[in-house]
A protein has these predicted regions:
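Terminal, charged accessory segments of proteins
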Residues: 1-182
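Catalytic core segments in nucleotide and nucleic-acid processing enzymes
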Residues: 190-346
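Generic alpha-helical propensity signal that fires on short helical segments
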Residues: 59, 63, 129, 184, ...
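A short, highly charged nucleic-acid-interacting micro-segment common to nuclease
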Residues: 152-156, 182-201
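Short amphipathic alpha-helical segments at helix-loop
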Residues: 147, 185-186, 264
Length: 346
């Protein structure tokens, strides 16, 4: 399958992670063709900012310092003396200004400037440049030191998706120094794809199988004595059918290699097996439900890929792959088959 299909599927995965992408304002993106993931993200952020401009750019109070002939706000005495502004019959004052030069708008502008250095189409770059006009009074921000712990309220909640996409873009395109030259990193590395893959599978099951109450549930240890130093156990996806008293724990994995080699012998990643086994056995001890587990790897190009059913210590386990490089309808069928095999046909 072509790289174009994988890029398109990444967009669909994002549409589950960011539900706003399913709104009409973004529908035309689905029909576009992209050269790479950077081009796709540029299209999303362009459309997102265009939609935001139809409302308004977020404003907030920022502190401005200026030399003024009339008093405003707080007088900066030391600065006024140092600059001898009184000789010009002026004072250095600091005051609050309701401005579009907000922290989030700085992130948006810096993201646009970063994308202009990326490998995206000329028409896309022209579209991004046209948006910069609206940010002429907005300062840039150091993209290496952004505080992503942003606060949202009724006035800026439409920025939540924009900031999420900006974070993916900036972390994917951060410039690194190598021999004095700046270069762009791979846009979506293994770590970022791992988080997107996990979020996609969880949100897919939340949307299409609400009766299974999909969530990233915590698992308590079946232990006696002091347990405060035991690591927490949080599943990627837990599905629960209360009527059938069945629980399925899914641990998603996105690796460049879904198998490990030990002494020239291929095997499943031992840490992953221990992890899913621990989740299932500890969960089973705290419930009357039948508990099963799946290690769900994103499919790679390896000769040997996981695809096996196992019974371990009386519990059913699967180690299987999800092929992301197929038409999205086929991708959905793979996810639906997991539900069918574990809750419907079982």
């Amino acid at each position: 399958m072509s790289n174009e299909i994988l890029i398109k599927n990444i967009y669909y995965m994002l549409s589950y992670a960011f539900q706003v992408l399913n709104q009409n304002g973004y529908k035309n993106i689905e029909t576009e063709r992209f050269n790479n993931t950077a081009d796709m993200f540029a299209a999303i952020i362009q459309k997102g900012i265009e939609n935001q401009l139809k409302r308004y750019l977020n404003r907030e109070y920022v502190i401005e310092t200026d030399s003024l002939s009339t008093l405003r706000g707080k007088i900066e005495i030391n600065e006024s003396i140092n600059q001898m502004s009184f000789l010009k019959k002026k004072l250095i004052c600091s005051y609050d200004e309701f401005s579009i030069d907000s922290y989030m708008n700085r992130i948006l502008k810096s993201t646009l400037l970063l994308l202009l250095k990326a490998d995206i189409s000329k028409s896309r770059k022209q579209g991004l440049k046209s948006l910069l006009v609206y940010f002429s009074s907005v300062h840039e921000i150091d993209v290496h030191h952004i505080n992503w712990k942003l606060q949202y309220n009724q006035n800026n909640q439409t920025y939540q998706m924009l900031m999420g996409i900006c974070k993916l873009i900036i972390q994917g395109l951060l410039q690194t120094q190598s021999n004095g030259k700046s270069k762009l990193m791979d846009f979506l590395d293994e770590q970022r794809m791992c988080r997107l893959y996990e979020k996609f599978v969880l949100e897919y099951y939340k949307k299409h199988y609400p009766e299974l109450h999909a969530n990233a549930a915590m698992v308590d240890w079946d232990a006696e004595g002091e347990t405060q130093y035991l690591p927490s156990m949080q599943t990627d996806i837990t599905l629960c059918d209360e009527k059938q008293k069945k629980i399925l724990i899914i641990d998603t994995k996105y690796y460049n290699s879904s198998m490990q080699l030990q002494f020239e012998r291929a095997s499943y990643h031992s840490g992953n097996m221990y992890q899913i086994l621990s989740y299932v056995k500890n969960k089973e001890s705290k419930t009357k439900c039948k508990v099963s587990g799946i290690l769900l790897y994103a499919k790679t190009n390896e000769d040997i890929t996981p695809n096996q059913h196992l019974s371990i210590l009386g519990n059913h386990f699967e180690v299987r792959t999800l092929d992301l490089n197929v038409d999205f309808s086929t991708l959905k069928s793979q996810l639906d088959l997991i539900i069918h095999n574990n809750f419907i046909a079982a």
